[in-house]
């Protein structure tokens, strides 16, 4: 397993043993905001509605299609969105995805060269208020995403998102969207490059307009 940081890469087409992979999952995970209380007691929980999306682009970095909770399947049926999570983890990290993007690599239509992964705040909650966020890339023996605490996926990579307030490109302060990274074709295989660029973009459309600058 690879612990990704900005600029890190992982092969999506083969596992650590060189076995060919046909289906991989991108699981986004985040926590609800704890508020109030004293010394860890009392207080409440504020639901956090983040949205995971993917943007498919051609070799010229032009958008072909976006898959998100309102359009769950790509036109070639290679990419599927699990659905909208409106809350986040309310009792700490439960080891499961809040939203999952499944990708069948061999079914992606040939004109797609890049698949960018995005996470943005639907309710415009700032990232520096959210206790944790992360992405993991994995496979499963049954071809299904992780929806049970006792699941044992084969994790290819983890990307724990950390606030670096000293880096204007990745700081969480005042930001509500992040370009997690992108998958790309290379020598007949699919690779993934982690980015972690944050912004104050308030919609998927705004992010789509700036995406080519990061790829």
PLM-predicted stretches and their roles:
Residues 1-215:
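Intrinsic-disorder/low-complexity signal
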């Amino acid at each position: 397993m690879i612990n990704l940081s900005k600029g890190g890469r992982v092969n999506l087409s083969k596992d650590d043993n060189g076995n060919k992979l046909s289906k991989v999952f991108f699981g986004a995970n985040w926590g609800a905001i704890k508020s109030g209380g004293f010394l860890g007691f009392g207080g409440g929980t504020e639901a956090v509605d983040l949205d995971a999306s993917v943007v498919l682009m051609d070799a010229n970095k032009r958008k072909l299609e976006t898959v998100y909770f309102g359009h769950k399947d790509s036109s070639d049926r290679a990419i599927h969105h699990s659905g909208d999570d409106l809350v986040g983890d309310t009792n700490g990290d439960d080891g499961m995805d809040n939203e999952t993007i499944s990708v069948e690599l061999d079914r992606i239509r040939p004109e797609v060269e890049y698949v960018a992964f995005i996470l943005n705040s639907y309710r415009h909650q700032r990232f520096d208020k959210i206790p944790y966020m992360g992405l993991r890339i994995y496979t499963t023996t049954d071809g299904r995403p992780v929806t049970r605490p006792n699941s044992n996926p084969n994790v290819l990579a983890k990307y724990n998102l950390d606030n670096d307030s000293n880096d204007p490109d990745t700081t969480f302060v005042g930001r509500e969207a992040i370009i997690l990274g992108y998958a790309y074709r290379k020598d007949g295989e699919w690779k993934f490059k982690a980015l972690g660029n944050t912004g104050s973009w308030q919609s998927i459309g705004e992010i789509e307009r700036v995406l080519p600058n990061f790829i």
